């Protein structure tokens, strides 16, 4: 769905700092995505990012430099999304000097090194809360009066992503920047949902998350992550019907028996991995070669959906990403191609980059379609 460009004077206004009418007053008490009341005594200036993908949220808010306030983070891009890290490092070279604490969902971290950076806020993903509690990270930070603010793009992505960005905008005194993005986000999601609301029967979709990352097929998500995104665009996620938890493996025989209407593989460029190397500055020929190899795996080629050429690939990190509206656009087009024949998800990414950030608008390959 192409979006007409606006005048340069509007673009300048969009990427400028917030107007005083949105200025936050501190001390400030907010309710995070875990339903907890969090009080901040002053505007946070030294932030920990438990999940490094939140740097893309910071890019929407601190547009001149999303690393300006970050003193420690889990640099997932360096490990799992090589070209995104290259882009960030080239644009903001100081990012390479920020402590990479390797903060895992299991709560493993050298907390003393993190605390030595004198943080005044930790932004964390809600899915990590149990591990952070069990490891004592939350209690230790609380004892030092360092607030932990939970956001969510994965447990319930269609519902929680926009409120998470609004929350961060309020906490970081960037409400106008946040609102500009979330207004766009909600408009795009509403447009998708209006088109799929009356579709019956709903398409049945299987998402093989990180296809090729394991010798076994088929790893997938339940109601969260990719499952939540599939459901948000008006389709049935097969993993939600079969898994007791957030993610897990479904046997190939079971996938075949479920007769999905669309088979979607996700991936990103991550070293020598065998997954789809989708992402910024990806090589379309490399993506196509890897996709064809994945579809030729023993048994996978026998899935009726693949025989019918209804297999697709999508950039993996949309499953837990503040820009997941782009991922939902790709899903909508892949799952309901006739309904969304005029939708161009690439345009959504370009629009976000150009209107809500100062990131370079690099070429990318975020999707793949069988037979093209």
Describe each model-derived feature in a short phrase.
Residues 22-372:
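N-terminal ligand-binding lobe of clamshell/alpha-beta domains
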Residues 1-5:
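Positively charged n-region of N-terminal signal peptides that target proteins for export
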């Amino acid at each position: 769905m192409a979006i007409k460009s606006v005048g340069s004077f509007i673009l300048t206004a969009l990427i400028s700092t917030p107007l005083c009418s949105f200025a936050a007053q501190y001390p400030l008490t907010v309710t995070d995505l875990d339903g907890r009341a969090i009080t901040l005594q002053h505007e946070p200036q030294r932030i920990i990012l438990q999940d490094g993908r939140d740097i893309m949220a910071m890019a929407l808010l601190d547009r001149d430099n999303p690393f300006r306030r970050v003193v420690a983070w889990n640099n997932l891009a360096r490990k799992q999304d090589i070209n995104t890290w290259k882009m960030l490092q080239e644009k903001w070279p100081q990012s390479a000097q920020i402590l990479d604490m390797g903060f895992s969902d299991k709560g493993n971290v050298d907390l003393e090194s993190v605390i030595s950076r004198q943080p005044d806020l930790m932004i964390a993903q809600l899915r990590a809360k149990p591990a952070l509690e069990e490891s004592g990270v939350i209690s230790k930070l609380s004892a030092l009066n360092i607030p932990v603010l939970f956001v969510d793009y994965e447990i319930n992505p269609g519902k929680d992503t926009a409120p998470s960005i609004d929350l961060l905008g309020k906490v970081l005194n960037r409400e106008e920047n946040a609102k500009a993005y979330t207004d766009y986000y909600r408009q795009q999601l509403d447009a998708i949902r209006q088109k799929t609301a009356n579709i019956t029967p709903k398409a049945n979709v299987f998402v093989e998350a990180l296809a090729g990352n394991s010798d076994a097929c088929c790893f997938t998500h339940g109601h969260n992550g990719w499952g939540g995104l599939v459901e948000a665009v008006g389709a049935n996620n097969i993993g939600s019907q079969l898994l007791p938890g957030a993610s897990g493996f479904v046997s190939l025989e079971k996938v075949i028996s479920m007769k999905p209407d669309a088979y979607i593989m996700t991936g990103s460029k991550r070293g020598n991995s065998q997954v789809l190397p989708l992402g910024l500055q990806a090589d379309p020929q490399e993506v196509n070669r890897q996709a064809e190899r994945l579809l030729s795996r023993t048994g996978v080629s026998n899935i009726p959906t693949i025989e019918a050429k209804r297999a697709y690939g999508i950039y993996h990190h949309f499953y837990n990403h503040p820009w997941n509206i782009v991922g939902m656009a790709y899903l909508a087009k892949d799952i309901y191609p006739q309904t969304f024949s005029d939708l161009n998800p690439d345009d959504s990414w370009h629009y976000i980059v150009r209107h809500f950030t100062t990131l370079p608008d690099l070429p990318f390959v975020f999707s793949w379609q069988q037979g093209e």
